[in-house]
């Protein structure tokens, strides 16, 4: 449905996208994950035809049959929910009776059926996104694109929104969604990591985990400020990152199961041995490693 071939986009000297190659097929729920400034919104603006790439190509087979939920709420705040949907239907030439029936079904699906007369400007962030989703679905698209739809939304609304997306995908809709939240990737059938305009890796969650080439150890300690610098000095360790209340210790290339006794010896007398264990990498671990590898490769090319 969407194919990007060496896709690049620059704004002056800033490279928002750098040589992105990606294919998204019919029936997928694809999550594009990356921090602010990664290039996610630029990717969507090109996919929806709002801007042209600087070089490379993007082909969107559903350009005339797509729904789009932008990052910022783009409906009329001085119109009610019902009025916004009626206006959207009129703009796209949807029959009035058909539009009314679809709107009722959509609002019931997202839990807004009791609020049809409420002005959009009076809605909470989560309710605004549900309205934006309903507006995007009003034309029964073949492809749904959503640019960070849950950013700034409370946790309960986030969960409800993703439940709705999961139901839509189960019904056969192809969905492409961007998010800065790693935990939301579990909802997707396939994931892409985007960082500073570079597509670092793609795959299912399990494929990405299996592709992780390093040994990873978790250290649980209440004295992380003392533990972290000590580990960072060990040659067989190339990264020590804080994940919530624990440390993830990444072995250098070629370091395998011997990482655990190395960590235990380094932290002897400071951390109990049973507080040190090998773990499966999280998506954030995988993202960080791929970003580090891309930075190293770029440095080598520059040199």
Across the structure, where does each feature detected by a protein language model lie?
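Conserved ABC ATPase signature
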Residues: 119-123
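Conserved ABC ATPase "signature" region
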Residues: 86, 90, 97-115
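Helix-to-loop junction immediately C-terminal to a conserved catalytic motif
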Residues: 48
């Amino acid at each position: 449905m969407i194919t990007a071939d060496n896709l690049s986009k620059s704004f002056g000297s800033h490279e928002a996208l750098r040589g992105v190659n990606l294919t998204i097929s019919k029936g997928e729920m694809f999550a594009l994950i990356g921090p602010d400034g990664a290039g996610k919104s630029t990717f969507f603006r090109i996919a929806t035809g709002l801007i042209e790439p600087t070089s490379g190509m993007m082909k969107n087979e559903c350009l005339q049959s797509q729904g789009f939920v932008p990052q910022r709420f783009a409906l009329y705040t001085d119109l009610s929910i019902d009025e916004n949907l009626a206006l959207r239907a009129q703009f796209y030439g949807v029959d009035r009776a058909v539009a009314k029936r679809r709107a009722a079904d959509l609002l019931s699906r997202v839990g807004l059926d009791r609020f049809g007369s409420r002005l959009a400007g009076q809605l909470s962030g989560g309710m605004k996104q549900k309205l934006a989703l309903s507006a995007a679905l009003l034309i029964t698209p073949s492809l749904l694109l959503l640019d960070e739809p849950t950013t700034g939304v409370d946790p309960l609304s986030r969960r409800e929104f993703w439940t709705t997306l999961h139901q839509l995908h189960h019904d056969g809709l192809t969905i492409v969604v961007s998010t800065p939240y790693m935990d939301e990737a579990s909802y997707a059938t396939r994931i892409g990591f985007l960082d500073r305009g570079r597509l670092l890796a793609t795959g299912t969650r399990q494929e990405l985990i299996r592709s992780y080439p390093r040994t990873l150890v978790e250290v649980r300690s209440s004295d992380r400020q003392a533990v972290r610098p000590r580990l960072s000095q060990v040659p067989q360790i190339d990264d020590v990152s804080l994940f919530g209340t624990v440390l993830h210790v990444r072995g250098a290339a070629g370091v395998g199961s011997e990482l655990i006794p190395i960590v235990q010896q380094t932290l002897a007398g400071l951390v109990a041995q049973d507080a040190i264990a090998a773990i499966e990498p999280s998506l954030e671990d995988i993202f960080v490693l791929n970003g580090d590898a891309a930075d190293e490769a770029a440095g080598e090319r520059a040199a």
